[in-house]
Structures are given as structure tokens and as C-alpha cells.
A protein has these predicted regions:
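Bacterial Sec-dependent N-terminal signal peptides
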Residues: 1-25
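C-terminal/domain-edge helix-coil "capping" segments
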Residues: 20-30, 111-210
Length: 210
């Protein structure tokens, strides 16, 4: 669990360096709040599907309603302006390093012939203008020992949106303050989870590794 927490914290640090969190437009946030959010799940069953559904059902408050679809549905149904989408995206930087993100997207009217490309259950050609908020993730971690971090990601994303709408976040400088808040959240979670992890490890040892 400690490695999962450190991975998540490293992701937030990287995100700060990239200075990319999403929109700074309060009007875009206000419009998005009136939509229904479609939570895009992996194709087929996966640990990610189960954990993101649990996280959304427990913590999603940004829009009044949400529903679940699979990434395969993006290929058969066009994006809709009256919907927002919580999905995984993949970005590649100038040095050809790939990064995966949990991204909230404002739907739009696709142009004729415009196709949504998907790789490893993540959209690879999302128009940057449609991004409302995003956080870097490690797909393997959030599908394994770091699954509980999805709850934190969902909460932090909504906190960002709330602060943009209220005008507290207006640009890169004010957005960077989020990093301090997230670091405190991860530190607090680590204090709670690490003792529990030690207890479980001791129990497994006593039980012969079961």
C-alpha cells in the first residue's frame, strides 16, 4: 500500500510540473454541472470497473445524475454535448513518454468522420478544449493495491471543479495550490493505511501466508 500511495503522490507531483489540471473557465463548469455524467468503464470485466463504480456511487456529487457505459460504446455512439464523460485518457509528451489520466470531459458534437481512438481502454485523441479536469493515474496501480486511491481522485477532481467555479482557481498559479491539498490528503491516508497494512501482514504471517 505504501508503494501505491507513493506512486499516486509522484503522479500529483508530475501533474504539477505539467501545470495542466483542466479548464479555468467558471462558465464551463457551471454548464457541465447541468449534464448527466457517463462513467466510461473498461471493455469487459476488470478491477478498475469495480473500484471506479464504487468510488462514483460513494462520492460523485458534481452532477445530479450519472450512468455507466463501456469504452466500446464510444465507438458506436457519438459524444453528446448534453453529457459529460469520466474516462481514462492517454497522452504522449514531446519525449514520447506516455501518461494515463482520469479525465472529466465535456461532450461535444462530433464532426462527420471524427473517430474516438481507444488504446488499452484509454482515449488517445481527446480534444484538449473538452477537458474539464484530469489527474494522472497508474492504470495498473488503481486496478490493484492502489484501488482505494480512486476514491481520493474522485474527491480531488470535484474539489478542483468547485474551486474553479467559485473563482478561487483562475490560472496556473492558483491551480498549483491544489498540490499542497492533495499531498496532505495522501499523507493522512498513509497514516491510516500503513498501520492496517502491518496488521494484515502480521496476520498472514501467523496464518502461514494465507
Amino acid at each position: 500500500m505504501r508503494s501505491a500511495l507513493l506512486t499516486a503522490l509522484s503522479a500529483i507531483t508530475f501533474l504539477s510540473a505539467q501545470a495542466q489540471y483542466g479548464t479555468f473557465d467558471p462558465k464551463a463548469i457551471a454548464t457541465a454541472k447541468t449534464t448527466t455524467t457517463l462513467i466510461v468503464l473498461d471493455a469487459g470485466d476488470s478491477p478498475y470497473n469495480r473500484t471506479i463504480q464504487e468510488a462514483v456511487k460513494a462520492h460523485w456529487k458534481f452532477t445530479k445524475s450519472f450512468d455507466f457505459i463501456t469504452v466500446n460504446d464510444l465507438a458506436t455512439a457519438p459524444m453528446m454535448p448534453e453529457k459529460t464523460y469520466l474516462l481514462k485518457t492517454k497522452k504522449t509528451d514531446a519525449e514520447k513518454h506516455d501518461g494515463y489520466f482520469l479525465t472529466l470531459v465535456q461532450g461535444w458534437k462530433q464532426k462527420k468522420g471524427e473517430v474516438i481512438n481507444v488504446e488499452n481502454n484509454a482515449v488517445t485523441n481527446l480534444p484538449p478544449a473538452q477537458e474539464l479536469a484530469f489527474l494522472m493515474i497508474d492504470p495498473a496501480t488503481v486496478s490493484g493495491t492502489g484501488a482505494p486511491m480512486l476514491n481520493v481522485y474522485v474527491k480531488c477532481m470535484q474539489d478542483y471543479l468547485k474551486q474553479v467555479e467559485s473563482g478561487k482557481i483562475k490560472d496556473k498559479a492558483t491551480a498549483d495550490r491544489i498540490v499542497d491539498i492533495l499531498e496532505e490528503s495522501f499523507a493522512a491516508m498513509e497514516m491510516v493505511m500503513l498501520p492496517r497494512e502491518a496488521e494484515l501482514a502480521a496476520a498472514r504471517a501467523e496464518g502461514g501466508g494465507a
